[in-house]
Swiss-Prot record:
Catalytic activity: cholesterol + NADP(+) = 7-dehydrocholesterol + NADPH + H(+); 7-dehydrodesmosterol + NADPH + H(+) = desmosterol + NADP(+)
Name of the protein described by the UniProt record: 7-dehydrocholesterol reductase
Family: Belongs to the ERG4/ERG24 family.
Top EC category: oxidoreductase
Any one GO molecular-function label of the UniProt entry: NADP binding
Organism (species): Xenopus tropicalis (Western clawed frog)
Amino acid sequence: MGERRRANASRGDKKVANGEKPHVGQWGRAWEVDYFSLAAVLFLLAFAPLIVYYFVMSCDQYQCALTAPVLDLYWGKAQLSDIWDKTPALTWGAAKIYIVWVSFQVFLYMLVPDILHKFVPGYEGGVQEGARTPAGLINKYQVNGLQAWTITHLLWFANAYHFHWFSPTIIIDNWVPLLWCANLLGYSVATFALLKAYFFPTNAHDCKFTGNFFYDYMMGIEFNPRIGKWFDFKLFFNGRPGIVAWTLINLSYAAKQQELYGQVTNSMILVNVLQAIYVVDFFWNESWYLKTIDICHDHFGWYLGWGDCVWLPYLYTLQGLYLVYNPVELSTATAVGVLLLGLIGYYIFRMTNHQKDLFRRTNGNCKIWGKKPKSIECSYTSADGKRHYSKLMISGFWGVARHLNYTGDLMGSLAYCLACGFDHLLPYFYFTYMTILLVHRCIRDEHRCSSKYGKDWKLYTDAVPYRLLPGLF
């Protein structure tokens, strides 16, 4: 939502002079916790780690059959202790792999400034500004995720085809021990962020304390916790180590399939290609990501810290893991259909975001679908008392639905799952989860915008009445 030029300030000042009270945008997460939110927080803190373990264990011990462990326990064929005894423990080898991995990503993030933006047309890297925080600050970020991803994968392929320092299957071979390492990092980061918010916050004005320990621990207190000038917890953990690892994990799955069966199935290739497109897109548009809900709304706590270390790399890659244990060779027609669904979904996702970015960068002085875009003008006041102005576009994809980028994202998510066939439920967890996540994100984002823009937001929703599916929702 592009910032309006300073010329518009006179109109806003006139409204104040006429006695019209400006709307103060209290965006960001809640100050107070209702019972439903607290119950959801307690549920996730208690069961999210068990859910991840259950999915990984189901593949490791039951060929990815989700109901098999429950049935074995029900019929007395196994005890919980039997399942636990078969679970690989944390090993020093896995710990070394994980320490080297995270340290290398910190090195690339902090000590290798981006140079790609200097010679890659259209890529925006280097020092970039984020969105305005609730306290009125605009933080600067070192955007070098695409460079880090490229260096990491060049080294991966150089090792696989030339140096042979380690096996390409190293990740899948240590998958469960690495789970314990990821949990240790996730909980450590979340706990550190909580303590930091109390004792040495980066910006105390962007902290929110509810008084409820569990809610604050999960949803975070600090908006943008940092160490030093550049190490931003949100940007690092949202992109690295989880999303950089995503494509490496899939490559390790493909290598394992080759090792076990002597070939890589077309379904595994589809999953690798479609998810790689999403990952590369994320890093290509990392500067745009600074203006999204993860950065603009979420505080940094267990939800982001543990989620990015554990939930993302372990549950977002379930399709590839499933195909290691259950190889699927799709017919040509089915493979083409899945590919088209994924590519069309990506096109909608990317073009929707591109239209918003173009609109923001040009302050609406551009063409969307061959016409000058229409918009609704909004104003809001940050916590420092300053009044700001924005435009909400109601043309192009943004005139079809308020979150059509999420619709495209869901189409891509479904394509990943369809590549695995219909024999098991496990691959479809991702689509189910993403549907719940994005619908919730729709509602949460709109609540934030309603709080931020007030009556102006109502004008926008009247102009664009549907969220995801025109005519339905």
